[in-house]
């Protein structure tokens, strides 16, 4: 059995966790009290959804997940919410005082008091697995817990479970909608620390998702619930192949093999289609070709950047629902003829395709329409360097004046860590730039007219 353990850190991680597990439960027909009427083989754990749920003798299905926050209020909502019976009380771990948007508190002072409890709990979950394949870590870059505690936890997971994959779902600080002034600091510190410990990180930019909700779902003022439900759909599409039997089952290591050409370049861009409200879906026919084309629209991306300015290194299309390979091949051939997509010259224009026959599920009463087919595209493109450049620029503006730095130093950090982290991100931008250069550029500049 190839189990995955989900770890939800900080407010963003926990709230994404709520949306994701709510959707998983609906998809698998698991009730809020963890019972699963459709599961006839009680106690037999060979069903594919057992990668994400463990089955108890009493026929309950418990998520293989841990929720961690350094302050209790957000996790308390889970403890008293609709799904309170779904989780084991020990899976919900909280501290007493929060990280106050401060990476140093999450990573050093407050985080280190709770990290052993969390690792113990993860160890217990790992012991219940027959063949653990890895961890999915949900967090934000901007918060103190999401940035500081996550990076501490990832370091420790690398020590304890060296060879296991670690995939992140990270909320990237939105350019316009910032919840904290120091988000650029936290983001850059956490990226620097986790860069070598993470195998693949799917970034989600709040602002991009705001725009999608506003534009495609006609929600004037999207709430976090709207955002998280949309993120839930995306996570569900990415993990569907692990939870259902499909024509092409992608496991965690397969993601890395196909999307990550170099260890540091592990930030795929996620695009999901169709995001459409019920009123519109009624009047539109969403064919395979249409949803595939929608994936190449910058407007449907989860991070604000323009792939038309970058080059693709790899591309995965994960379809679910009523989709046949013939339609997919036609859609891809059509896209290749348009040639709006530029691949790097050292990578053949390969699209990896996964088809899963389980149709997309929607949360009842939510904003998304029920559709018969959907697609999630994961592409590794050099355009995502734009996102890093934006963040680095903000970091520089503040750090030039050493604004807010004393809060970090006061919690036991050294100023050198800031410079070190910033240099690492400069190197990351450079890496992206080099990867996008044509391999012929280096040797011979004149022969530029072989088009």
From Swiss-Prot:
Keywords: Acetylation, Cytoplasm, Cytoskeleton, GTP-binding, Hydrolase, Magnesium, Metal-binding, Microtubule, Nucleotide-binding. It holds the Pfam family Tubulin. Its EC number is 3.6.5.-. CDD domains: alpha_tubulin. InterPro entries: Alpha_tubulin, Tub_FtsZ_C, Tubulin, Tubulin/FtsZ-like_C, Tubulin/FtsZ_2-layer-sand-dom, Tubulin/FtsZ_GTPase_sf, Tubulin_C, Tubulin_CS. One of its GO terms (molecular function) is metal ion binding. Disulfide bonds: none annotated. The record marks 451 as: Involved in polymerization. The keyword Metal-binding applies. Its main location: cytoplasm. This is Tubulin alpha-1 chain. Mg(2+) binds at residue 71. It comes from Homarus americanus. GTP binds at residues 11, 71, 140, 144-145, 179, 206, 228.
